Every structure is written in structure tokens, then in C-alpha cells.
Amino acid sequence: MFEIIPILAFEDNYIWLLHQHGHALVVDPGDAHPVLEILDARGLQLRAILVTHHHQDHTGGVEELIQATSAQVFAPAKEQFSFPHHPVTAGDRLDIPGIALSLSVLDVPGHTVGHVAYYGDGMLFSGDTLFGAGCGRLFEGTPGQMYSSLQQLAQLPVNTRVYCGHEYTERNLAFALSLEPHHEALLSRREATAALRAQGLPSLPSSMALELATNPFLRCHEPGIIAASKSAATDPVSVFAAIREMRNHF
């Protein structure tokens, strides 16, 4: 078995560190220093760095980690990076040296045009595509692209554990409840999330089952979300675009 450690960076970023038998990988290291501290404290050898997209808060620590370790870097083929890396795209499989784990690469454009996610062994590292009770802003992609990406992730097994790039769950739940104030699953999740955060614990990982039940961006076909969106068109992409715009100003 392996252990997954959430490393908080900046205000609300998560760098995910997975290790087994002294070998480790990290996902989206925006800052090298907290990663190096844990590697040193636990006597771990960093073998791989996985990048989901090009934003600085997810890549800022990569070059320093390359210099400090022998780690290989895997990053989206459709995006540009200044550091050496192995470009990855949909369908690629990554076998991490020293760790009994094989990950599949999923293309999930929307937040950025080349964004990828990594899935394997019941785990999804979703970057800034899927959040707890939310999804990423559309900085580069279209509503149709992001909706399609989210629907792709929604097809994963319901027991998939979801490791997101940011601690946004409480704010996302507040927005979701502004759409559906009396939704029992949302109210229950808000209570559970508040209890975790009050203890200084992450609200993550989530699960795909929980997201399917409470994430409005995965429920754009449901009558309650359609009504709350006030969208003139009721197809799921139009509803998604409407509530994503509402979330931008929430």
C-alpha cells in the first residue's frame, strides 16, 4: 500500500505526494520547499513529478525539484513548459519507478486547453478541472469543452477518490446551496466539510459518488439546476455555462 500526503501550498493549493517503499511522486508542485522538507523528513526519493496544466501555482516548484532530485517530469503535450519533461496525452499509461502504480492520462480541456488528469488504482488527480462541489474557471477553454471533460470524469467508478488542486469545497458548497437551498445532500456535505475544516483537516479527497450527488456542474441535466440557472436554453451545456458564470461572480 502507499500513503498519500496533502501538502498545502500558498493559500489554498494542494500538492499531492504519494509514496511507497521509500519512493515518491508528487502532483502539481507549485512550491518546491514543502515537498523537499517532507522528502527529507521521511527519507523519500522523488521519482516522478506529474503536472496537470501550465499555471504557475501548479508548476512553480518543478525546476527546483528537478535540480534537487532525479525525478522524471510528465506534463501535458498540448501545453508549453520551460522545464524538461515527457509530454503526455489521452491514453498514455505511466508506470512510476519504485511504486506499484499505473496511471492513465485523461485529456480534460476547459480550465486550460491542454489540461490533463491522472487516473489509476481508484484515484483521480483532477488538477483544476474537478473540485469538491465545483469545477475550474474557463481561462482558455469553452463551456462545451469543460462540460465534456466533467462528463468524462463522471463516468469513472463511483468509488473513485478525487484529489483536487485547491481547497475550495466550502465556498463551492455555499454556491451550490444558493442554487438549491434545501438540498439535503448538500446540507449534509456542508456540515461534514465544516467539521473537517474546523479541525484544520482537508475536505479532500472527495469521491465520485459524492460529486455526482452534490456537485452542480455534474448535475446540469437535473430539473433543480436547470431552474436555478435561469438559462433560456435548457440543454446541459447552456445550463453549465450559465451556472459557471454565476459562480464567477459569487
UniProtKB/Swiss-Prot annotation:
Binding-site residues, Zn(2+) 1: H53, H55, H111, D128
Protein residues bound to Zn(2+) 2: D57, H58, D128, H166
Pfam families: HAGH_C (PF16123), Lactamase_B (PF00753)
Pathway terms, separated by semicolons: Secondary metabolite metabolism; methylglyoxal degradation; (R)-lactate from methylglyoxal: step 2/2
InterPro entries per UniProt: Clx_II_MBL, Glyoxalase_II_hydrolase, HAGH_C, Hydroxyacylglutathione_Hdrlase, Metallo-B-lactamas, RibonucZ/Hydroxyglut_hydro
EC number(s) reported in the record: 3.1.2.6
Protein name: Hydroxyacylglutathione hydrolase
Organism of provenance: Methylobacillus flagellatus (strain ATCC 51484 / DSM 6875 / VKM B-1610 / KT)
